[in-house]
């Protein structure tokens, strides 16, 4: 928990600060803006911040694939208000999709992001060796974000 908290506390404070700056304009937030802010703050700008983020995502990948009830409770207890605010903004950005579906799509998106970033070093090596294409984290995130946005915007049909 302490490891997650060292990453999540500054991350959640930065997100809260960004959202607070919106003031009364929260209802005008677009999906692209919301996800872009989350990703930019999670990844950071410096090489050190990016390395730290990749370590966090590797740990998150381990936690995500195992039943970690204590971590789920920890996140719920410590970051519930921020997640509820995020979900409210998501609902405003995509009013045609029910909140329960947005909750699921958030988990699908998180899974995609975690899987991609926890294996970034391997993906970088494969891309270089097999395709002669060096990948930087910024380029991967630049391509990952539209993929995640498309997942959120996928048509909803009650099944």
List each language-model region with its residue ranges.
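An amphipathic alpha-helix adjacent to DNA-recognition modules
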Residues: 1-20, 24, 28, 72, ...
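Hydrophobic faces of stable alpha-helices that mediate helix-helix packing
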Residues: 8, 12, 57, 80-87
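A short secondary-structure junction motif
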Residues: 10-14, 18, 63, 67, ...
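Amphipathic, well-packed alpha-helical segments that form the structural scaffold of globular domains
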Residues: 12, 16, 39-40, 61, ...
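Hydrophobic alpha-helical connector segments
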Residues: 13-56
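Short linear capping/connector segments at secondary-structure termini
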Residues: 20-21, 60-62, 126-130
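C-terminal peripheral helix-coil segments that are non-catalytic and often amphipathic
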Residues: 33, 41, 77-159
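Amphipathic alpha-helical segments used for helix-helix packing
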Residues: 33, 50-77, 121-124
